[in-house]
C-alpha cells in the first residue's frame, strides 16, 4: 500500500513539471518601450530589412535582407537601439506568430501605420524565451 502511494506521487510529480519547464526569463533589454497602444498589439510601421541579422538568442528575430518587418514596439533607454516586431511570413504566413527584437539599424521604415505615442513599461514576458 505504501509503495503504491509513493509510485502515485512520483507519477503525479513527473506529469506536472514546475513552472520553469516551459521556458525561461531572460535579462531585460529595457524598462520601457513606445507602442501604438497600451497592449502593443497594433503595428507602428512597416519596414524592409537592409541586411541579414542572425538572432543571438531567443529574444531576437533572425531576419533576412529584403524581408518585410512589422514593427510593434521601440525600446527606450538602454535598449533604444532595438525594436520589437515580426517578420512577414511568420506573422502573416502559415506558421505561428513570432515576435522578437532586432537592431533598428538593419531596417528601413517605409510606411507608418500608427504613431508610437504610448509609453509602456516592459515586463518579464517581453523577454521570456520558450
UniProtKB/Swiss-Prot annotation:
Name the InterPro entries for this protein.
Answer: MIA, SH3-like_dom_sf, SH3_domain
This protein's record includes keyword Oxidoreductase: no
Record's keyword annotation contains Secreted: yes
Q: Which cysteines are joined by disulfide bonds?
A: 35-40, 58-129
Signal peptide position in this chain? 1-22
Q: Where does the UniProt entry say this protein principally localizes?
A: secreted
Which cellular components does GO assign to this protein? extracellular region
Q: What induces it?
A: Repressed by retinoic acid.
Subunit comment? Interacts with FASLG.
| Role according to the record | May function during cartilage development and maintenance.
Which protein is depicted?
Melanoma-derived growth regulatory protein
**Source species, please?**
Bos taurus
UniProt lineage: Eukaryota, Metazoa, Chordata, Craniata, Vertebrata
Amino acid at each position: 500500500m505504501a509503495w503504491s502511494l509513493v509510485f502515485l506521487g512520483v507519477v503525479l510529480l513527473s506529469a506536472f513539471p514546475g513552472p520553469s519547464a516551459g521556458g525561461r526569463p531572460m535579462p531585460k533589454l529595457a524598462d520601457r518601450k513606445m507602442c501604438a497602444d497600451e497592449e502593443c498589439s497594433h503595428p507602428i510601421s512597416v519596414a524592409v530589412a537592409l541586411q541579414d541579422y542572425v538572432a543571438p538568442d531567443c529574444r531576437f528575430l533572425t531576419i533576412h535582407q529584403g524581408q518585410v518587418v512589422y514593427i510593434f514596439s521601440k525600446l527606450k533607454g538602454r535598449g533604444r537601439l532595438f525594436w520589437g516586431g515580426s517578420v512577414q511570413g511568420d506573422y502573416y504566413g502559415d506558421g505561428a506568430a513570432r515576435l522578437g527584437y532586432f537592431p533598428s539599424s538593419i531596417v528601413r521604415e517605409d510606411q507608418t501605420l500608427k504613431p508610437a505615442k504610448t509609453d509602456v513599461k516592459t515586463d518579464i514576458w517581453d523577454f521570456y524565451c520558450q
